[in-house]
Amino acid sequence: MALERTFSIIKPNAVANNNIGAIYARFESAGFKIIAAKMLHLTKEQAEGFYAEHKGRPFFDGLVEFMTSGPIIVQVLEGENAVQRHRDIMGATNPDNALAGTLRADFADSFTANAVHGSDAVESAQREIAYFFAADEIFPRS
């Protein structure tokens, strides 16, 4: 297996519900190292830019509105096969379909307010990490 980095967001509902620590505990117990993290409140422009690939889809405006509704936590996770393993612990996008014990099964409020975001490929992880973090904000830990 290859050591990878993936990008993760703890969404506004999970921040508001005080689930940050529980989610971080899951990341660490799954073997991820958190090598960059920050809390921020997205502007409409930042959210639209981040989710630009979804522009024109029926859910886009609601997603932007939700993602700007409160603070989020963005982080870079590092570990073996990080992209897929992070997707596995997140669970299905629709929390109604998420397996018990996954982040979305445990912390999501709805399809849009599904607690977490994670990169879907190594290439998108690189792009998403660069959207929120400068190279000097990432601290690999061995």
Swiss-Prot record:
Q: Report whether Cytoplasm shows up as a keyword of the record.
A: yes
Enzyme type, top EC level: transferase
The active site of this protein is located at: H117
The question of whether tRNA-binding is a record keyword is answered with no
What's the EC number here?
2.7.4.6
The UniProt keywords, alphabetically, are: ATP-binding, Cytoplasm, Kinase, Magnesium, Metal-binding, Nucleotide metabolism, Nucleotide-binding, Phosphoprotein, Transferase
GO BP terms, alphabetized? CTP biosynthetic process; GTP biosynthetic process; UTP biosynthetic process
Question: Where is the protein found, in the record's own terms?
Answer: Cytoplasm
Query: What Gene3D superfamilies does the record tag this protein with?
Result: Nucleoside diphosphate kinase-like domain (3.30.70.141)
Family per record: Belongs to the NDK family.
Record note on quaternary structure: Homotetramer.
Its protein name is: Nucleoside diphosphate kinase
Organism, scientific name:
Yersinia pseudotuberculosis serotype O:3 (strain YPIII)
Name of the encoding gene: ndk
